[in-house]
Amino acid sequence: MESEDVQALVIDNGSGMCKAGFAGDDAPRAVFPSIVGRPRYTGVMVGMGQKDSYIGDEAQSRKGILTLKYPIEHGIVTNWDDMEKIWHHTFYNELRVAPEEHPVLLTEAPLNPKANREKMTQIMFETFNTPAMYVAIQAVLSLYASGRTTGIVMDSGDGVSHTVPIYEGYSLPHAILRLDLAGRDLTDYMMKILTERGYSFTTTAEREIVRDIKEKLAYVALDFEAELQTAASSSALEKSYELPDGQVITIGNERFRCPEALFQPSFLGMESAGIHETTYNSIMKCDVDIRKDLYSNVVLSGGSTMFPGIADRMNKELTALAPSTMKIKIIAPPERKYSVWIGGSILASLPTFQQMWISKEEYDESGPSIVHRKCF
């Protein structure tokens, strides 16, 4: 590939937010919700230039009259037509580039169905005519961004959480664990517990308001039971939030009850282990000789690890599970919301990476299955 002078595009398609930009940059140029909105009503004003669908921030700002759909659920694309719209919007409206002129690096969750990455590959080459592309595993990119080659990444986004142990740059597939519990589930849970307080949030548009409440006010308690006691006996933990219509609501123990579900999935009626236990289980599936290195390099990544207090709590929980002499270090980089994208930007601009791209020629020769041979 003679793409030396052409900047590669890096697109981190999250279940909740799409992060896009140019390889070599230190932050994504465009960050917008992975949403496609369609009008709930028929237009009556002629000449308003109404569209049959809106994408990203445009959909977000008109949410009162739209039905919002997320084409990516639990890290897996469930609606390819909408996904294509999001990519089209990314190239032409956000980045303002011609996709046929740039190699494209996409990301995906580990343990995704094979068909998912094949279809991504097919759309990139056949619909957008990209000269080259690559699909990278999200957690591996986060580790790159933290400047490490060994560690265990606990990545929790909007749709999926997973723990990926990586040793000397190799991910250890047998020890990767996936947890279909992430930000969107926390938002839904917040909707539910706010209902108990007498505030009703039901529509897709109202869910976005609750997501904002969660992002602005929620935190992780170091000791959940003690925090509940504190919340019950004083109003020190209460915060108020103004809704778009001016009504002010007060939230108290919901602030830490919501993200507690990451550590106690039983709150959501799920039988799975919490993120701390999943991390521990993942480490235990690795060779006994490398566990020490993993315990001392637990890297948090993704938007659902942005809650204040999460690193301290993670440290406390892992310390309780691990052997008593083990040194445990949780790394929570401030830019971890975007660390997958940043890692992608680093990877796509490495000189050694240039021979890793899948070229249009290779695709035409082998078809979509080439992605399994060239990308891991």
Curated annotation (Swiss-Prot):
Main location: cytoplasm
Catalytic reaction list: ATP + H2O = ADP + phosphate + H(+)
Membrane-spanning parts: none
CDD domains per the UniProt record, alphabetical: ASKHA_NBD_actin
Molecular function GO terms recorded: ATP binding; hydrolase activity; myosin binding; structural constituent of cytoskeleton
UniProtKB keywords: ATP-binding, Cytoplasm, Cytoskeleton, Hydrolase, Nucleotide-binding
Subcellular location: Cytoplasm, Cytoskeleton
SUPFAM superfamilies documented for this protein: Actin-like ATPase domain (SSF53067)
This protein's GO CC annotations: actin cytoskeleton; cell cortex; cell leading edge; cell pole; cell-cell junction; cortical actin cytoskeleton; early phagosome; intranuclear rod
Origin: domain of life: Eukaryota
GO biological process terms on file: cell morphogenesis; phagocytosis; plasma membrane repair; response to cAMP
EC number(s) reported in the record: 3.6.4.-
Pfam (any one): Actin
Similarity comment: family membership: Belongs to the actin family.
PANTHER family for this protein: ACTIN (PTHR11937)
Function summary: Actins are highly conserved proteins that are involved in various types of cell motility and are ubiquitously expressed in all eukaryotic cells. Multiple isoforms are involved in various cellular functions such as cytoskeleton structure, cell mobility, chromosome movement and muscle contraction.
Name of this chain's protein: Actin-3
Organism: Dictyostelium discoideum
Source taxonomy: Eukaryota, Amoebozoa, Evosea, Eumycetozoa, Dictyostelia
